[in-house]
Amino acid sequence: MAENRRNDREQSEFEERVVSINRVTKVVKGGRRLRFAALVVVGDRNGRVGFGTGKAQEVPEAIRKAIEAAKKNLITVPMVGTTLPHEALGVFGGGKILLKPAVEGAGVAAGGAVRAVLELAGVADVTSKSLGSNTPINVVRATVDGLTQLKRAEEVAALRGKSVSDFA
């Protein structure tokens, strides 16, 4: 009983977005084996976001597996108001994503997979540019890489043993 309540709470806590569903085949002696691969991003729109992949013979099962994987792979995004603290360049494989903070009210200027990650992370004002590979998994991983590089001014000041006013 307690297990069911925990699952209900987790489902309501995170919002999911399916970024891509890919039909993949494995050629075997008897022919082709068809399966589906799903890429899902989950987030609470309050600074926590994660992604996961799942593979199964049916699409709903692949999505369920991807959601489970995404919930185990969450990161925390430091934010300044509704935007990012500074620019970041995330790289994964051939995909590069440039993330830039934007003024309040600018909205999310990003496409496809990048938009899904940023919106579910709760970033409301940001500009992004996709450079290189536009494969959804590379783009999502590069975006998450860029978000993990972000640090608030307070964190940088603490690391350097200075006060925040020294950076101004």
From Swiss-Prot:
Lineage: Bacteria, Bacillati, Bacillota, Bacilli, Lactobacillales
Native source organism of the sequence: Lactococcus lactis subsp. cremoris (strain MG1363)
Keyword presence, Cytoplasm: no
One of the record's GO molecular function terms: rRNA binding
S-S bridge residues: none
Notes on the domains: The N-terminal domain interacts with the head of the 30S subunit; the C-terminal domain interacts with the body and contacts protein S4. The interaction surface between S4 and S5 is involved in control of translational fidelity.
Subunit field text: Part of the 30S ribosomal subunit. Contacts proteins S4 and S8.
Protein name, entry field: Small ribosomal subunit protein uS5
Function as written in the Swiss-Prot or TrEMBL entry: With S4 and S12 plays an important role in translational accuracy. Located at the back of the 30S subunit body where it stabilizes the conformation of the head with respect to the body.
Domain S5 DRBM: 14-77
UniProt record similarity statement: Belongs to the universal ribosomal protein uS5 family.
